[in-house]
């Protein structure tokens, strides 16, 4: 299960794989952080800072729902 949460005041999008859990963050791009479990080393989420600035629309609610296509990695 993938959970999305948008913090409008902070302009931050949080994406969690499964239930949110303890993780460390590693910056993988401009204002994009990969969240890795401190217990298993698995990727457990993604954090996108300054989320609305990535789109022409200032109303982030128009961006949702987001279609996501997932592929199983070999």
Annotate the PLM regions.
Residues 1-74:
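Small, basic N-terminal interaction modules of short regulatory proteins
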């Amino acid at each position: 299960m993938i959970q999305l949460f948008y913090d409008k005041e902070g302009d931050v999008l949080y994406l969690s794989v499964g239930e949110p859990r303890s993780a460390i963050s590693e910056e993988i791009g401009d204002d994009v952080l990969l969240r890795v479990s401190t217990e298993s080393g698995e990727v457990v989420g993604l954090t996108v800072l300054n989320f609305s600035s990535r789109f022409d629309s200032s109303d982030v609610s128009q961006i949702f729902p987001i279609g996501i296509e997932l592929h199983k990695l070999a």
